[in-house]
Amino acid sequence: MELKKLMEHISIIPDYRQTWKVEHKLSDILLLTICAVISGAEGWEDIEDFGETHLDFLKQYGDFENGIPVHDTIARVVSCISPAKFHECFINWMRDCHSSDDKDVIAIDGKTLRHSYDKSRRRGAIHVISAFSTMHSLVIGQIKTDEKSNEITAIPELLNMLDIKGKIITTDAMGCQKDIAEKIQKQGGDYLFAVKGTQGRLNKAFEEKFPLKELNNPEHDSYAISEKSHGREEIRLHIVCDVPDELIDFTFEWKGLKKLCVAVSFRSIIAEQKKEPEMTVRYYISSADLTAEKFATAIRNHWHVENKLHWRLDVVMNEDDCKIRRGNAAELFSGIRHIAINILTNDKVFKAGLRRKMRKAAMDRNYLASVLAGSGLS
């Protein structure tokens, strides 16, 4: 995952500025922005300040003939970049440097950039859908929608950009759509979808197939996990079965459907053992030939997108507090954060959390150079 490869892909992004007015190359501005975000920059002024402090370092990788651009120039140039071209470069870069694994679970989930709305221009907050490799903890693709409700139409567009052959694609209930299932199958992947309560017939079929008696004493393949933490105990039971004859009609509606899956969780407070545990039941459908244990692993991996991506973006990078709104800048800056997370996550030299890695990159040029060079990366 070397910076050189990334910059080769970024070099194809068109620069729409008038040539005679250009003082700072587009590639230099993007290089500066990426390095600054890796080092903890959260806005345009942070990026300018980083550049002024690290100009001699940056000249090892770019030209910077006219020094560091001011923050207004950085903001103006980045906001005019084509998001489609940027996402294309990002995905091609990840394909080039990230080895594919047929056992991978790709979690697709969306996140709203809360402060990206622009009241004065009547523009709502943007919603970014990410494809996350749970095996490698890397973002492998992203696409923007204007609202969460548009995920249904955006997910197929994102899938078009990805190589999902042999992978299991997981989504939340919003992505549980027949058209999406068919598209995943056509691209050689398998799906594992959470079933929506609004899907009446399918939801009812699950309720009839898995009554409370079956959940307490499963007759089908099952796998249980018990965990204790912070004074609480949770038992998670996973049940998987083939599609029974009485529900065979669903295999014509959902392409490739093979398994009905149920996840049951029993939560209790250890100090209050006399109380009945809180019970939650979730239904899933899958085209993959899953065992109960593999099903448990897959749905647990799906939540890595929350813990290893969204949490990092919000808590470590303060994405929700970012008020960058100009032009395409909010969407582009989201993608640059993904680049920074990928580069830092893949660094195996300094074994620390993302926040410490960012601080070290800001303070230690040798470490930043090591990260950019792909030193110690898989």
Curated annotation (Swiss-Prot):
Domain of life: Bacteria
Protein name: H repeat-associated putative transposase YhhI
MF-aspect GO terms: DNA binding; transposase activity
Pfam families registered for this protein in UniProt: DDE_Tnp_1, DDE_Tnp_1_assoc
UniProt source species: Escherichia coli (strain K12)
Family assignment from sequence similarity: Belongs to the transposase 11 family.
GO biological process assignments: DNA transposition
InterPro entries xref list: ISAs1_transpos, Transposase_11, Transposase_11-like, YbfD_N
